[in-house]
Amino acid sequence: RVGIIGNSDGHKGRPGASYPGAGWFGAVGGLTCFLMPELTRESLIKCINSRHHYATTGGPSGRMLLSVSMSFDEPATQYLDDPMIAKACSTKKCLDAIMGDIVHLPVGNSNLKVSVDAASPVRCIDIFNGLEHLECYRPYAESDLGDRIGVLWEGAEYRGRFRAVSWDGSAHFNKAKISSTSAVNFFNRDKTIDSVSSSDLAWQSVTTGNSAGFITELTDSRS
């Protein structure tokens, strides 16, 4: 019964493209995708009530098309109203459902289908059942990584203002040499990652619930 919405807490009138400047603002404004058959007020309200929507972190890679659906081996009951709120709920039989639907399946198995179309490569897809982490799907093999190493950090100190976390640090490679480095989500002009030497990196980074990091390509990485 969860429908997630992502908003842009900026002051520039650019939803999904409100980047932080200097200081401790560390994330891009979020976006919400509503799955509606038509762009009308009635369709929007029905979409929200049905939880047929999802949130992204915004930015160039945050305008993904996400489809999540389930199919059932046996007929299931779909609640058209929330049974936790409405005393009398309308229902219908179904063999499939999409994100946000409330479904009761007394017998039989269900099959989950997820499709993601994004402007950047998909690193992984985590599947949860409530708080239980069921599986992490990665659309690549270890051999596809080559000589690249990715280091990521994420999170917030707590919910609310002043939740920013400082991730200032450094990395040293004992034998391998740094060929190139790409920063991941370094949005602040005063927070950078620098090559100190052929074996060392140093960076300043801040997150406020989002993720950041770097991808380094090494030479002689297997030594």
Residue spans for each PLM region:
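C-terminal functional module detector
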Residues: 1-223
